[in-house]
């Protein structure tokens, strides 16, 4: 029995040692093959590195409510931003007052670009926007605009009282900042009351221009940003005739994507955005009107 036990113990020990040798040998083969194939270092990196799925940020669709005077410039800015970020932007253009009402009612807007900072400030007082996102992005100007081919000789806002001018379109001053500026300019030169029978109101500054484009009115007072880089004739109205159209943007608290919206806002006020804003006639921070 004793010999049997000793034999059995040695047999088990020998088997165990042989098994360890086999495992060790096989392990060496695997390690050697991995080293040859160059898979050791990458395997370590993959173990410690988050997957591509976790790192890559999903593209989102931003909803931007913007004043109608931005109808041309903002899509150009958004196109550049989309190319750089792969995010998408959908615009809701309209009069600032009406857009502010939509946000007041809880519309899921990612970025609000107003034609007058007053509307942003009012939303801020109601606690409806992130206060730290408020930023001026430009100062607007107004022009006397006629469609291409018009034979009217208009060199000054006072010329609007001429009898040959029958109808003049302006943005509704009840909710459109550019309409307010137009009324102020007319009041400054003393023609507001005299023009009442001639005035046709557009819901926003873009619709106001369309009235003149289609010939429904003789001319329109519109944003400079809708006059430049476009066919038609226009005359700049002196900025001292009305209060500055200080335009402000902010991110509403109803925004589904506030972090991404902040990046778009920064892009608008960044180098590329400012270049395009200047192209469309906006006065930027630190600049003064030419006339």
Description of each model-found segment:
Residues 8-9, 16, 51:
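Serine residues within intrinsically disordered or low-complexity segments
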